[in-house]
Amino acid sequence: MKEFAMNGTPVKMWAKMCDATAWQQISNLCSLPFVFHHLALMPDLHGGKGMPIGTVLATRNVVIPNAVGVDIGCGMCAVKTNIQVETIEKDVLRKKIMRGIRHQIPLGMEHHKVAQDEKYMPENHDIDGMTVVKRQYISATKQVGTLGGGNHFIELQKDDEGWLWIMIHSGSRNLGKQVCDYYNRVATILNERYFSSVKSDLNLSFLPLKTKEFNDYWHEMQYCIDFGLCNRRLMMQRIQEVISEAIPHVEFEPMINIAHNYASWESHFGENCIIHRKGATSAREGEVGIIPGSQGTSSYIVEGLGNPLSFMSCSHGAGRIMSRTEAVKTLNLAVEIHKLDEKGIVHAIRSQEDLEEVSAAYKDIELVMAQESDLVKIKTHLLPIAVIKG
């Protein structure tokens, strides 16, 4: 971990690689007047919108919608089974399980044609008091239980003892984006009205504590966090149904779930502050988390070490080293297909456009894990056997 100061703000950086966009955004963050204690940068750091992905930002009495990001509540879930991977026939894996999952779960920008039962939606929220969620609710009932696009994925994996695992990466779909964009606009208007020193072109407009706008965003953000969990839970339920039909004697352990795009009130260094985790995972002492690799590489079930210097956080994955556009333009399709085929991984890479999320576009997950050995310890090492990308 490297320590330095920028614009008077201490920075603690676990990342060994940092792109130019991220450096500028770090400088912008360090100029904010309400940063608390220091800025923490995880090893999967790379440029985002306003704040780099892989950043943990602590603030005094303000919340920044773009420091949470557009996919509010995005996160991971994983389930271990009692099935040895070597006992699954190839035809069962490809034709029953993978085909069944694709049939049950809409991918990319697709959604269900009919609204899902409201029992799958978040409970105990006053939706009537929410501007965006109320407007988007009917649409959201068709999005719950859908994967989404980008780096979202469903993987079947095996651990070092050969047991089958299911892993999902997904979030709050279009709902989270609508909430983020709306409240970022609200924050920008407020900041300009009151002559804030935080310029709108930084994409770091904020909502002050004890304002209606802060409370409104906070409630809608919490709904999106819960919606992200509901989304992953429903997908996991339907994947389990597909596997149960193909392998009737299968049993499933309880689901591990953790989010990596959200804000929360927490106590650090003797004070209550708002922690923004954007592409960062909570890693309190003993807390179980999930750090996925890129397509075709290892993923990890981890246990937090509660390191106070990272605000008890760790990375959320490997982190990009190449934009999606650059990956499509520069990577070799045949080479990337061969990498997966050589490992025997069932995949659906067929065209140049599918190269957006291949492993060559990401940092080496093994190096990322080595760089955060003081943040988490590895509980389970997982390797992919089949992958579905959004």
Predicted regions and their residues:
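Domain-length cofactor-binding catalytic modules of enzymes
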Residues: 2-25, 34-39, 47-53, 57, ...
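Beta-strand elements of modular eukaryotic interaction domains
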Residues: 30
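A generic, well-ordered mixed alpha/beta core segment in the N-terminal half of proteins
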Residues: 67-127
